[in-house]
Design a protein with these regions (language model features):
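Helix-breaking motifs and short loop linkers at transmembrane-helix boundaries and internal kinks
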Residues: 18-23, 245-249
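A membrane-interface helix-boundary motif in multi-pass transporters
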Residues: 80-95, 308-331
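Juxtamembrane intracellular "pre-TM" segments in multi-pass secondary transporters
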Residues: 113-142, 174-175, 183-186
Length: 352
């Protein structure tokens, strides 16, 4: 199935080179989403099948760190290549997919498990069974609203915020003073004779996560899932507040805000996804992970909610205010989550 996912990914990415109409791009992106829908639950299920209660938090942390190697390098490489031609960025993505296919063929080994002899209808019945648990379905919806909407809002808005609302020439000088002209030059471009930081090269968390995720997971594994998740949301909310303050003239705060959001993400995201996966028996881990992506999908509404809101605040001369609203969203969500846990109870993880 991993091979099937790659074979679905590859032509979809290459089609972006030739597609020009809105409908064509939309259909191509749906095809990429279909490939991701195959790929991601398989990987989560593999991690679940090869870990137990003693090492699952670390296992999911390692997986999350590896995901963010791509999350770190991808925006930097794409940012450099799209400055030359968008086609080069798509060629690089296709090459990475081809490399994943080769690595899978050479190194991936199927985890030991009992083979299921179930027909498609029986599998669909299991999905209905999982979602018919109103407490579980309500929890997924709540996680989508409380966490995934602000999460995706960060990635939708941060590069735009940096490029349009901050002094990117001053950001270049700050980076040059700390990391040197070589690194700062790689993360910037020339615009009218001045070096300016490209928003997409710094407005992500992957480079932070791939360095410190495992250490964070080691600390977080000592705590129960929901309190750990709530702590992550609090740290992310603080990051949003700092990001908003960067628009007041202290542009260097954008780096601190991104770092704090990354720490919150490292605490909250792998922990809550591990928790949802461990609500199911090992043989149904992929199924429950698939339902988890329904919560992730709720985050798509961040574009509808927060991108127009940013535009309104920016037009009014207060672009940083959108981050304060996002911080309030997380804090209010924590209160709703606590109320839900009190009324519906905490769902128990499956024993090994």
């Amino acid at each position: 199935m991993l091979i099937a996912a790659y074979l679905a990914y590859l032509p979809s990415v290459l089609l972006l080179i030739f597609t020009r109409s809105f409908s064509g791009i939309a259909l191509t992106m749906l095809s990429i989403g279909f490939a991701a829908g195959i790929f991601k639950p398989l990987v989560f299920g593999t991690v679940r099948a090869t870990t137990d209660q003693t090492n699952s938090t670390l296992g999911f942390g390692i997986f999350y760190a590896m995901v963010n190697v791509g999350g770190s390098l991808g925006p930097v490489i794409a940012g450099r290549l799209r400055a030359i031609s968008w086609n080069y960025a798509f060629y690089a993505a296709a090459a990475a997919i081809g490399l994943m296919l080769v690595i899978t063929l050479l190194f991936y080994r199927e985890p030991a498990r009992e083979l299921e002899r179930k027909r498609l209808g029986e599998k669909l019945a299991e999905i209905r069974e999982a979602l018919s648990d109103l407490r579980f379905a309500g929890f997924l919806l709540l996680i989508g609203v409380v966490f995934w909407i602000p999460f995706w809002a960060f990635f939708n808005l941060c590069a735009l915020y940096v490029d349009r609302s901050l002094d990117t020439a001053a950001l270049y000088e700050l980076l040059r003073g700390v990391l040197g002209a070589g690194v700062a030059g790689f993360l910037s471009h020339d615009e009218g004779g001045a070096r300016r930081i490209l928003g997409e090269t710094i407005s992500h968390t992957g480079y932070i996560i791939m360095i410190v995720q495992i250490a964070v997971s080691r600390v977080v594994e000592r705590f129960r899932p929901i309190p750990a998740f709530a702590t992550g949301l609090c740290v992310a909310a603080l990051g949003f507040v700092v990001l908003g303050a960067a628009a007041t003239g202290r542009v260097g705060l954008v780096f601190l805000g991104i770092f704090l959001f990354a720490v919150g993400e490292m605490i909250a995201s792998p922990r809550i996804q591990e928790y949802i996966t461990r609500l199911a028996p090992k043989e149904k881990a992929g199924l429950y992970t698939g339902t988890n992506f329904l919560a992730v999908g709720v985050g798509a509404f961040s574009g509808v909610l927060y991108t127009p809101l940013y535009g309104r605040f920016a037009d009014a001369g207060h672009p940083g205010w959108v981050w304060y609203v996002l911080a309030g969203h997380l804090v209010a969500g924590l209160l709703v989550l606590a109320l839900y846990q009190r009324l519906a109870g905490t769902m128990a993880e499956q024993a090994e």
